[in-house]
Amino acid sequence: MSNAKDNFNVADLTAALNAEDRDDLVNVLKNKLQGLTGKHSNVLENLSPNVRKRVEVLREIQTQHDELEAKFFEERAALEAKYQKQYQPLYAKRSEIVNGVVEVDGEATQTAAADEEEDKDSVEKGVPDFWVTAMKNNEVLAEEITERDEGALKFLKDIKWSRIENPKGFKLEFFFETNPYFTNTVLTKTYHMIDEDEPILEKAIGTEIEWHPGKCLTQKILKKKPKKGSKNSKPITKIEQCESFFNFFSPPQVPDDEEDIDEDAAEELQNLMEQDYDIGSTIRDKIIPHAVSWFTGEAAQDEDYIDLEDDEDEEDDEDEDEDEEDEEEEDEDEDDDDEDEHVTKTKKKSSAGRKRSGGAPAADGQPGERPPECKQQ
């Protein structure tokens, strides 16, 4: 997966977590939780009786909060489901216009430019390249879409999402016209969540794409000329996985044997799954509900504006820190100047004293004594 931060390739993703792997994961989590519980118990035991009582009351308050939060999540899900149904007629109308099924109402004012484009408009239906343009204008998705992908994504007619209940999660559906790349008319991506209210991914399942011969976008064929003098004169052909948006339909796979995966590989796998979920949630939460704004680029500008505000806030904080540092340095410089001035005055006084005394040592060794800096010379 082409992510600038992690530099992982989606081509390495192939399948979903199986039941055995999930059981192993649950056991590991249980062991960790037991260890954490022991640590928490030690914390409470180390508290004084009065403080421990207060903490116990705080825990009861937290339990009440968690119950309210659970109720909030439940009501929010019901509210989202209610409005999701009301969105559907709007999405259906959008799809009809985008795909040229219906024409918009009203007559446009005829101009000379419109006359020149009339023949072209009569052939051009709907809004060409609507979805691929919208997706490319999103920063997260733009990193996944290659030039080779664009040809296939031009046949994308619509994208829909829906909740699934058993197990909890959501499903994305990509509807395609008949195209020269693959035979599927619908590609799906399903996310199973451990907790619907929190983005904790259990597994993801994608459609197996049925590519036409020589049209697979997730692989590239490398041909290497045989070495001179080789008996085989035919070029050597090698197939390699390559970056492509369509790798999105091949989610990560955990090895059957957990011993085959080390800590670094496990961390990489986790990052891949997080990136995969990020792509899916971006399509669900941003592209589908605000598709025309992404098509025109307005949504991207809004995001850039928000990012710019955040950057300005960070710069302001940095400037304030720098100003404070400058003030501290100025104060230190002033202190140094005061010290230098004091030393100069001391030297002048000492010189005057030596002139008056003729430089002779005093009887007690103090009035005619040289200043400390002179002793060190």
Curated annotation (Swiss-Prot):
One of its GO terms (molecular function) is chromatin binding. A motif (Nuclear localization signal) lies at residues 223-228. Pfam families: NAP. The modification Cysteine methyl ester is found at C374. Residues 26-80 form a coiled coil. GO terms for cellular component: chromatin; cytoplasm; nucleus. It is found in: Nucleus; Cytoplasm. A motif (Nuclear export signal) lies at residues 47-62. Residues 375-377 form a propeptide. InterPro entries: NAP-like_sf (IPR037231), NAP_family (IPR002164). GO terms for biological process: double-strand break repair via homologous recombination; nucleosome assembly. Residues 345-357 have a biased composition (Basic residues). Keywords: Chaperone, Coiled coil, Cytoplasm, Lipoprotein, Methylation, Nucleus, Prenylation. Residues 300-341 have a biased composition (Acidic residues). Residues 298-377 are annotated as: Disordered. A lipid is attached at C374 (S-farnesyl cysteine). Belongs to the nucleosome assembly protein (NAP) family. Can form homomeric and heteromeric protein complexes with NAP1;4. Binds histones H2A and H2B in vivo. Also able to bind histones H1 and H4 in vitro. Interacts with CYCB1;1 and with alpha tubulin. May modulate chromatin structure by regulation of nucleosome assembly/disassembly. Could function together with B-type cyclins in the regulation of microtubule dynamics. This is Nucleosome assembly protein 1;3.
